[in-house]
Structures are given as C-alpha cells and as structure tokens.
Amino acid sequence: MKTKHYILIMGFFVSLSVQGQESWTLARCIAYAQEHASEVRRQTLEQEQKRADYRTSLLNFLPSVSAEVSGQYSWGRNIDPETNTYNNVTTFNNYYQLGASVTLFDGGAIWNAFRQARLDRASAQSAVQQARDDKAITVMEKYVDAVYTRRSIALAEEKWRDSKALLVKTQRLFELGEKSRPDVVQVESQVAEDEYNLLHQRHLADKALNDLKTAMNFPAGDSLAVSALPVDVHTAATLPANRTACDSLMRHGFFLAERPAVTVAAAKAEHARMEWKIQRAALLPKLSLGGGEATNYYKNLTAGYKAEGFGSQFRNNMGEYVYMTLSIPIFNASSWNRARRAKTDWQEAQLDLAEARRKQHDDALQAVLDYHGYAREVEQLQRKVASDSLAHHLSSRKYEEGMLSVYDLHTTAQTLMQSRLLLLQSEMMLALKARLVNYYVTGELGVRN
C-alpha cells in the first residue's frame, strides 16, 4: 500500500510540474542546442580565423618594406685607409637604410596560398553548417527518445490502473464465492509487476530527459518538458515530397545535393592539393627584385678631430641601390620530404572524400529503407493494437463470467501492452526517419516551431 501511495503522489506532483511549465518543441530544443553547442562555437571561431587568413594572403602580393637603423662604436688599433698605417682611434658609425622587395617568381607559392586561403574561407561556412546539422540530428534522436519514454509512462500507468481495477473486481468475486484465493493473489502479483514497470519506465524517462539535456548543453538543474510529439506521424507517413524523394533514391541510388559533410571533405581534399603545390614550389628557383636608399653618419672621437654635422653627412652620404636575386635550390632533403608528405596527404584526402560520399549515400539509402519500413510497421501495428484491444476486452468479459483464468487474462493484457509500446516506438522512429530523409534530399530537417 505504501508503494501505491508513493506512485500516486509522485505521479501527481510530476504532472503538476509538467503542466506548470512551457513545453519545449523539437525546433526550440534544436535552436537552443545549436546556440550553446561548443562544437558550433568552435567552428564559428575557426570561420573568423579563416577570414583573417584570407586577408593576409591578399597582402602577400604586395612588396615587403623594411627600415633598418644601426650604430657601431669601435676603439683600438686599426688601419687608416688614407695612409695605410696603423693608428689608435675611437670612432662612431651610424647607418640608416630603407628598402623594399617584391617576388617576381616563386613557383606559384603565393598564388596557391591565396587560392588555399580563399577556399578555406568558403568552406568554413560549410564546416559551421555541418556542426549545426550534426548537433540537430543528435538532439532530434534524444528528443524522440524522451518523447517515447514519456508516452510510455502513460501506457504503463494505464496498465497499472487497469490491473488495480481488476484486483477490485476479483476481490468482490472472491467474496461472492466466484473466484478463489489463488486468483486474488495472482492479480495482486500482476498489480505489483505493473507497479515495478511504471517505476522502471519513469527511471528510463528521467534518463532520456537527462541525455537530451546533455546533448543540448542545457543546465542539469533546470526543468525541461518536451512536447507530446515532434511531428504528426500520420502526416509524416504521407508526405508527397518525402515519398517522391524516397522513390528517387530507391530507383537511382543517389541524392539531390551534397550535404555539408561531403562539402567539407571536398574542401579538405582541394586544400591538400594546394598545399602540395605550395611545397613543390619550394623546389623551384625564386626570383625577386628589390631596391632602396641608404646613408650613414661617421665621427672620429679621437681628440682634435672635428666631424661634419649630422645633417650634412646624412644628405651627402645618401645613396640608392637596386638589386635582383635569383635563388636556385640544389639540394634540400627537408624540402623534398615536405613535398612528398604533402602529396601523400592530398591522396589520403581524396580517399576521405570518396569515403564521405559513400557514407552519405549509404546513410541516405538506409534512412529511406527505414522510412518505408517503419511506415509499413505503423500501419500493421495499428491493426494489431485494434485486434489486441478487442481481444483483451472480450477476455475481460469472459473472466468476469468465469470462463477464463487470471493467467490467460494477464497474457492478453501483456500482449496489448507490448503492441501499444511497439506502435509508439514505430511512430517515433517514423517521425525521426521522415526528417532524415528530408534532410538528405533537401538539406533541411523540416523542423518547424
């Protein structure tokens, strides 16, 4: 009796807490998860960095400009350049230089680096979308689990109440002499079993809700109530767009557009190809052109020597220069190894791209097969639930008339309960697979507020 009272009180307060707060729809849960997911934030930061890298690659086409100032203080014996004799003097030299240089040819390294940065900037958005899609699919799966377990509580509670009502009837029939004491005990055992199933189902529901909070990055201490159903399963089973898309996938074995995962894999393969070209350019000659201006100031600090003024020397010593440099790499083992490593990375990236496309194809086709399978299961289970419900009703009438044993009645009740749970599970999976099929065909999960 204490257990019964505990279940009633717990169910009463749980229902009050759920009714007292706003239910979260699937769209709201996905939006919250995408906003607070660390994976999405990380990809957003990476996107900003790719934009900065692209701007830097543009600046690499401009000449490099440098300025240099140096000072030299020397003393002791040295050779006088005028008399070619040794003397002992102390001097101070001050040098100034301003120069610029531009690369005329580097094997396409700068150009390919620019193309690589431009590609990375474009693919960064696909990486963000991939993170958002992955999070949406994860939350959708956890949301369906949470809805399923919550709905299962209602079925388990209904079964428990029916068993209690049956116990009351059996006790009255026992008092009238129409049922034996073992029948009453067997029904009491059935009630205890249903109490356990109800408690177990509540535990599974709490666990599923906690998994949903974890996937959403939702505060564990805050309450979260999910809506009754993510979609109308009857509408999902007859969506013309999904049915057409499914037939197209089944006939031709392909989907209409590449999803972000494949787009990102293709961008990585192209990035690796550009990197190979950049490393290969290091093995080619490099031609650069430069020029600038330079001047200096000199002063002999030995006693009795008078130097010209700083301004006069700065102007008189001013000179210009221009140069051209051709650098030819003859042997550099590390450069050859980096080029070889880059080519290997490119070949591996091509394999990853092929694998990503294959995986997308397999996942899409599997979603279509599951979608058709669960749609047929829902139709069949609806008929089975109707039949099992009628069979249980007739068995209850026979039991009241003394024509059926408690065990047989319990068997029909368990069969009806299992059919209802299977129907609920198939409905939830149909709703999930309908959205996945829509995602593989249109790129949208079809989530609406």
Protein language model features and the residues they cover:
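Bacterial N-terminal signal peptides
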Residues: 7-15
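A short glycine-centered flexible hinge/capping loop motif at secondary-structure junctions
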Residues: 174-178, 399-403, 440
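Short flexible linkers and secondary-structure junctions
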Residues: 21-142, 287, 291, 334-335, ...
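Sec/SRP-type N-terminal targeting helices
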Residues: 41-45, 58, 90, 104-132, ...
